[in-house]
Amino acid sequence: MESLNRMALELADEALEFTEELDIGAFELDTGTTVIDFGVEHDGGLEAGLLLAELQTAGLATVQTRVDTVGDATFPHVEVACDQPAVAMLGAQKAGWELAVDDYEALGSGPARALVATEGEFQAIDYVDAFEFAVLTLESTGLPTTAAASEVAARAGVTEESVFLPTYRTASVAGSVSAAARTVELAVFRLYELGYDPTDVLSASGCAPVAPVAGDEQTAIGRTNDALAHGGRVHLTVAEDFDAFDAVVSSAAARYDDPFAEVVGTDDWDAGDVDNGVFGPAQLTVDVVGGPTHAFGTVREDVLADGFGLS
Protein backbone atom coordinates (compact mmCIF):
# COMPACT_ATOMS: atom_id res chain seq x y z
CA MET A 1 0.00 0.00 0.00
CA GLU A 2 1.09 3.56 -0.69
CA SER A 3 2.44 5.43 2.33
CA LEU A 4 -0.41 6.92 4.37
CA ASN A 5 1.63 10.03 5.04
CA ARG A 6 2.42 10.46 1.35
CA MET A 7 -1.30 10.41 0.55
CA ALA A 8 -2.09 12.80 3.40
CA LEU A 9 0.69 15.16 2.30
CA GLU A 10 -1.09 15.66 -1.02
CA LEU A 11 -4.22 16.67 0.89
CA ALA A 12 -2.20 19.02 3.10
CA ASP A 13 -0.83 20.66 -0.05
CA GLU A 14 -4.42 21.09 -1.27
CA ALA A 15 -5.34 22.81 1.99
CA LEU A 16 -2.36 25.15 1.66
CA GLU A 17 -3.34 26.02 -1.90
CA PHE A 18 -6.92 26.94 -0.98
CA THR A 19 -6.61 28.55 2.46
CA GLU A 20 -8.66 31.61 1.50
CA GLU A 21 -11.45 29.61 -0.11
CA LEU A 22 -11.63 27.24 2.88
CA ASP A 23 -11.38 30.08 5.42
CA ILE A 24 -8.41 28.44 7.10
CA GLY A 25 -4.92 29.72 7.89
CA ALA A 26 -1.38 28.47 7.58
CA PHE A 27 2.04 29.48 8.86
CA GLU A 28 5.45 28.07 9.67
CA LEU A 29 6.87 27.79 13.17
CA ASP A 30 10.50 28.71 13.83
CA THR A 31 11.27 25.01 13.47
CA GLY A 32 10.00 25.03 9.89
CA THR A 33 6.96 22.96 10.84
CA THR A 34 3.82 23.85 8.88
CA VAL A 35 0.71 24.57 10.96
CA ILE A 36 -2.68 24.64 9.21
CA ASP A 37 -5.40 26.32 11.27
CA PHE A 38 -8.70 24.58 10.50
CA GLY A 39 -10.62 26.05 13.41
CA VAL A 40 -8.64 27.67 16.21
CA GLU A 41 -8.17 31.30 15.18
CA HIS A 42 -9.77 30.83 11.76
CA ASP A 43 -13.42 29.92 11.27
CA GLY A 44 -13.12 27.11 8.75
CA GLY A 45 -16.37 25.63 7.45
CA LEU A 46 -18.06 22.52 6.07
CA GLU A 47 -15.59 22.06 3.22
CA ALA A 48 -12.67 22.58 5.57
CA GLY A 49 -14.13 19.94 7.88
CA LEU A 50 -14.50 17.46 5.03
CA LEU A 51 -10.89 18.00 3.98
CA LEU A 52 -9.79 17.62 7.60
CA ALA A 53 -11.58 14.26 7.80
CA GLU A 54 -9.89 13.18 4.57
CA LEU A 55 -6.53 14.15 6.05
CA GLN A 56 -7.28 12.10 9.15
CA THR A 57 -8.08 9.04 7.03
CA ALA A 58 -5.08 9.68 4.75
CA GLY A 59 -7.35 9.96 1.72
CA LEU A 60 -8.56 6.37 2.00
CA ALA A 61 -12.16 7.37 2.73
CA THR A 62 -14.69 9.25 0.64
CA VAL A 63 -16.19 11.96 2.85
CA GLN A 64 -19.18 14.07 1.82
CA THR A 65 -22.23 15.86 3.21
CA ARG A 66 -25.95 15.66 2.68
CA VAL A 67 -28.90 17.38 4.34
CA ASP A 68 -31.20 15.39 6.63
CA THR A 69 -33.22 15.95 9.78
CA VAL A 70 -32.96 15.48 13.52
CA GLY A 71 -36.54 15.56 14.69
CA ASP A 72 -38.09 18.53 12.91
CA ALA A 73 -34.77 20.35 12.49
CA THR A 74 -32.55 20.30 9.41
CA PHE A 75 -28.88 19.41 9.84
CA PRO A 76 -25.99 18.59 7.54
CA HIS A 77 -24.93 14.96 7.86
CA VAL A 78 -21.51 13.54 7.03
CA GLU A 79 -21.26 10.34 5.01
CA VAL A 80 -18.11 8.21 4.96
CA ALA A 81 -17.30 5.24 2.72
CA CYS A 82 -14.09 3.22 2.82
CA ASP A 83 -12.74 -0.02 1.35
CA GLN A 84 -9.65 -0.08 3.58
CA PRO A 85 -11.31 0.52 6.96
CA ALA A 86 -8.76 -1.24 9.16
CA VAL A 87 -5.82 0.82 7.89
CA ALA A 88 -7.73 4.07 7.33
CA MET A 89 -9.54 4.12 10.66
CA LEU A 90 -7.19 2.31 13.05
CA GLY A 91 -3.94 3.21 11.31
CA ALA A 92 -4.76 6.87 10.72
CA GLN A 93 -8.08 8.36 11.84
CA LYS A 94 -8.15 7.06 15.41
CA ALA A 95 -7.28 9.78 17.93
CA GLY A 96 -4.54 7.80 19.62
CA TRP A 97 -1.68 10.30 20.06
CA GLU A 98 -1.88 12.23 23.33
CA LEU A 99 0.47 15.18 22.94
CA ALA A 100 1.47 17.07 26.08
CA VAL A 101 4.54 19.31 25.96
CA ASP A 102 5.00 21.96 28.64
CA ASP A 103 1.67 23.84 28.73
CA TYR A 104 0.47 22.62 25.34
CA GLU A 105 -1.98 19.71 25.11
CA ALA A 106 -3.62 18.14 22.08
CA LEU A 107 -5.16 14.89 20.91
CA GLY A 108 -3.55 13.73 17.70
CA SER A 109 -4.98 11.67 14.88
CA GLY A 110 -3.88 10.99 11.35
CA PRO A 111 -1.20 8.99 9.55
CA ALA A 112 1.79 10.24 11.58
CA ARG A 113 0.65 7.66 14.16
CA ALA A 114 1.62 4.96 11.66
CA LEU A 115 5.22 6.21 11.65
CA VAL A 116 5.38 5.53 15.40
CA ALA A 117 3.12 2.45 15.33
CA THR A 118 3.44 1.54 19.01
CA GLU A 119 -0.31 1.20 19.63
CA GLY A 120 -1.61 -2.36 19.73
CA GLU A 121 -3.90 -1.97 16.74
CA PHE A 122 -0.92 -1.58 14.38
CA GLN A 123 0.06 -5.16 15.08
CA ALA A 124 -3.53 -6.21 14.42
CA ILE A 125 -3.65 -4.46 11.03
CA ASP A 126 -0.05 -5.40 10.18
CA TYR A 127 0.87 -1.92 8.98
CA VAL A 128 3.77 0.41 9.75
CA ASP A 129 4.48 3.46 7.60
CA ALA A 130 7.88 4.69 6.44
CA PHE A 131 8.04 8.17 4.92
CA GLU A 132 10.08 11.35 5.29
CA PHE A 133 7.06 13.58 6.03
CA ALA A 134 4.55 13.34 8.88
CA VAL A 135 0.95 14.61 8.99
CA LEU A 136 -0.69 14.74 12.41
CA THR A 137 -4.00 16.55 13.00
CA LEU A 138 -4.32 18.11 16.44
CA GLU A 139 -7.54 18.64 18.36
CA SER A 140 -6.69 21.45 20.77
CA THR A 141 -7.81 24.82 22.07
CA GLY A 142 -4.56 26.40 20.89
CA LEU A 143 -2.15 26.31 17.98
CA PRO A 144 0.93 24.10 18.45
CA THR A 145 4.16 25.42 19.91
CA THR A 146 7.66 24.86 18.59
CA ALA A 147 8.30 22.44 21.46
CA ALA A 148 5.19 20.43 20.53
CA ALA A 149 6.26 20.32 16.89
CA SER A 150 9.74 19.14 17.89
CA GLU A 151 8.18 16.36 19.98
CA VAL A 152 6.09 15.18 17.02
CA ALA A 153 9.13 15.18 14.74
CA ALA A 154 11.24 13.25 17.22
CA ARG A 155 8.61 10.56 17.79
CA ALA A 156 7.79 10.24 14.09
CA GLY A 157 11.46 10.05 13.13
CA VAL A 158 11.39 12.95 10.68
CA THR A 159 12.86 16.45 10.57
CA GLU A 160 10.91 19.33 12.08
CA GLU A 161 10.60 20.90 8.62
CA SER A 162 8.84 17.75 7.43
CA VAL A 163 5.97 17.93 9.93
CA PHE A 164 2.50 19.20 9.01
CA LEU A 165 0.06 19.94 11.84
CA PRO A 166 -3.55 20.66 10.83
CA THR A 167 -5.13 21.96 14.05
CA TYR A 168 -8.70 22.63 15.18
CA ARG A 169 -10.90 23.12 18.22
CA THR A 170 -13.69 20.66 18.98
CA ALA A 171 -15.90 23.76 19.22
CA SER A 172 -15.52 24.72 15.56
CA VAL A 173 -17.31 23.92 12.33
CA ALA A 174 -14.44 21.71 11.19
CA GLY A 175 -14.42 20.06 14.60
CA SER A 176 -18.11 19.15 14.37
CA VAL A 177 -17.77 17.95 10.77
CA SER A 178 -14.67 15.82 11.35
CA ALA A 179 -16.24 14.31 14.47
CA ALA A 180 -19.32 13.26 12.47
CA ALA A 181 -16.94 11.49 10.08
CA ARG A 182 -15.86 9.08 12.84
CA THR A 183 -18.84 6.69 12.74
CA VAL A 184 -16.94 3.91 10.99
CA GLU A 185 -13.84 4.45 13.11
CA LEU A 186 -15.87 3.94 16.29
CA ALA A 187 -17.37 0.71 14.97
CA VAL A 188 -14.08 -0.76 13.74
CA PHE A 189 -12.18 0.18 16.90
CA ARG A 190 -14.95 -1.21 19.10
CA LEU A 191 -14.76 -4.49 17.17
CA TYR A 192 -11.00 -4.55 17.70
CA GLU A 193 -11.52 -3.99 21.44
CA LEU A 194 -14.00 -6.89 21.52
CA GLY A 195 -11.49 -9.25 19.91
CA TYR A 196 -12.59 -9.20 16.27
CA ASP A 197 -9.91 -9.14 13.57
CA PRO A 198 -10.24 -5.63 12.06
CA THR A 199 -8.78 -6.80 8.75
CA ASP A 200 -11.92 -8.93 8.32
CA VAL A 201 -13.88 -5.70 7.86
CA LEU A 202 -13.83 -5.51 4.07
CA SER A 203 -15.74 -2.29 3.46
CA ALA A 204 -17.57 0.21 5.59
CA SER A 205 -19.86 3.19 5.33
CA GLY A 206 -21.47 5.43 7.90
CA CYS A 207 -23.26 8.70 8.50
CA ALA A 208 -23.97 11.04 11.40
CA PRO A 209 -25.38 14.54 11.89
CA VAL A 210 -23.04 17.49 12.26
CA ALA A 211 -23.44 18.73 15.83
CA PRO A 212 -24.23 22.43 16.39
CA VAL A 213 -21.01 24.32 17.11
CA ALA A 214 -20.81 24.95 20.85
CA GLY A 215 -19.43 27.96 22.65
CA ASP A 216 -17.00 25.94 24.75
CA GLU A 217 -15.00 22.73 24.44
CA GLN A 218 -16.86 20.77 27.12
CA THR A 219 -20.23 21.33 25.47
CA ALA A 220 -18.71 20.60 22.06
CA ILE A 221 -17.33 17.27 23.28
CA GLY A 222 -20.78 16.36 24.55
CA ARG A 223 -22.58 17.30 21.36
CA THR A 224 -20.14 15.64 18.96
CA ASN A 225 -20.25 12.42 20.96
CA ASP A 226 -24.06 12.53 21.00
CA ALA A 227 -24.05 12.90 17.21
CA LEU A 228 -22.23 9.57 16.97
CA ALA A 229 -23.68 7.62 19.89
CA HIS A 230 -27.31 8.59 19.26
CA GLY A 231 -27.30 9.58 15.57
CA GLY A 232 -24.49 7.58 13.96
CA ARG A 233 -25.34 4.74 11.57
CA VAL A 234 -22.81 2.25 10.19
CA HIS A 235 -22.88 -0.54 7.60
CA LEU A 236 -20.06 -3.08 7.48
CA THR A 237 -19.31 -5.86 5.03
CA VAL A 238 -17.20 -8.47 6.81
CA ALA A 239 -15.49 -11.76 6.03
CA GLU A 240 -16.30 -13.56 9.28
CA ASP A 241 -19.27 -13.72 11.64
CA PHE A 242 -18.90 -12.75 15.31
CA ASP A 243 -20.94 -13.35 18.45
CA ALA A 244 -20.44 -9.85 19.87
CA PHE A 245 -21.51 -7.54 17.05
CA ASP A 246 -24.34 -6.41 19.33
CA ALA A 247 -21.81 -4.94 21.79
CA VAL A 248 -20.59 -2.42 19.20
CA VAL A 249 -23.60 -0.09 19.36
CA SER A 250 -23.92 2.54 22.08
CA SER A 251 -27.14 1.01 23.40
CA ALA A 252 -24.93 -1.68 24.96
CA ALA A 253 -23.67 0.95 27.43
CA ALA A 254 -25.22 1.32 30.87
CA ARG A 255 -26.10 5.03 30.43
CA TYR A 256 -27.28 4.89 26.85
CA ASP A 257 -30.41 6.96 27.54
CA ASP A 258 -28.46 10.04 28.68
CA PRO A 259 -26.82 12.81 26.63
CA PHE A 260 -23.05 12.58 26.77
CA ALA A 261 -22.75 15.75 28.84
CA GLU A 262 -24.69 14.04 31.62
CA VAL A 263 -22.59 10.87 31.38
CA VAL A 264 -19.29 12.71 31.91
CA GLY A 265 -20.79 15.25 34.28
CA THR A 266 -17.90 17.56 35.12
CA ASP A 267 -15.19 19.63 33.45
CA ASP A 268 -12.45 17.33 34.80
CA TRP A 269 -13.95 14.09 33.51
CA ASP A 270 -11.63 11.29 32.49
CA ALA A 271 -12.43 9.17 29.43
CA GLY A 272 -11.00 6.20 31.30
CA ASP A 273 -13.90 6.44 33.76
CA VAL A 274 -16.54 6.20 31.03
CA ASP A 275 -18.05 2.91 29.85
CA ASN A 276 -16.35 2.14 26.51
CA GLY A 277 -19.73 1.14 25.14
CA VAL A 278 -20.72 4.82 25.00
CA PHE A 279 -18.16 5.32 22.24
CA GLY A 280 -20.06 3.40 19.59
CA PRO A 281 -22.49 4.25 16.79
CA ALA A 282 -26.23 4.29 17.44
CA GLN A 283 -27.04 1.72 14.78
CA LEU A 284 -25.01 -1.02 13.10
CA THR A 285 -25.79 -3.31 10.18
CA VAL A 286 -23.33 -6.10 9.38
CA ASP A 287 -23.35 -8.12 6.17
CA VAL A 288 -21.32 -11.32 6.54
CA VAL A 289 -20.10 -12.43 3.11
CA GLY A 290 -21.85 -15.71 2.33
CA GLY A 291 -23.65 -15.54 5.68
CA PRO A 292 -26.32 -13.65 7.60
CA THR A 293 -27.07 -9.94 7.84
CA HIS A 294 -27.28 -8.55 11.38
CA ALA A 295 -28.82 -5.27 12.57
CA PHE A 296 -28.40 -3.76 16.03
CA GLY A 297 -29.31 -0.55 17.84
CA THR A 298 -31.40 2.41 16.81
CA VAL A 299 -31.08 6.16 16.31
CA ARG A 300 -32.37 8.13 19.30
CA GLU A 301 -33.52 11.49 18.01
CA ASP A 302 -34.99 12.38 21.40
CA VAL A 303 -31.60 12.13 23.11
CA LEU A 304 -29.97 13.92 20.16
CA ALA A 305 -32.43 16.80 20.42
CA ASP A 306 -31.70 17.09 24.13
CA GLY A 307 -27.93 16.98 23.66
CA PHE A 308 -28.04 19.43 20.74
CA GLY A 309 -30.15 21.87 22.78
CA LEU A 310 -32.99 21.89 20.25
CA SER A 311 -36.00 23.94 21.27
From Swiss-Prot:
GO terms for cellular component: cytoplasm. It is an enzyme of class 3 (hydrolase). Gene3D superfamilies: Methenyltetrahydromethanopterin Cyclohydrolase, Chain A, domain 1, Methenyltetrahydromethanopterin Cyclohydrolase, Chain A, domain 2. GO terms for molecular function: methenyltetrahydromethanopterin cyclohydrolase activity. The gene is mch. It comes from Halobacterium salinarum (strain ATCC 700922 / JCM 11081 / NRC-1) (Halobacterium halobium). HAMAP family: McH. Its EC number is 3.5.4.27. GO terms for biological process: one-carbon metabolic process. Coiled coil: none annotated. Pfam families: MCH. The keyword Phosphoprotein does not apply. The keyword Lipid metabolism does not apply. Disulfide bonds: none annotated. Belongs to the MCH family. It is found in: Cytoplasm. It catalyses: 5,10-methenyl-5,6,7,8-tetrahydromethanopterin + H2O = N(5)-formyl-5,6,7,8-tetrahydromethanopterin + H(+). This is Methenyltetrahydromethanopterin cyclohydrolase. Keywords: Cytoplasm, Hydrolase, One-carbon metabolism. Catalyzes the hydrolysis of methenyl-H(4)MPT(+) to 5-formyl-H(4)MPT.
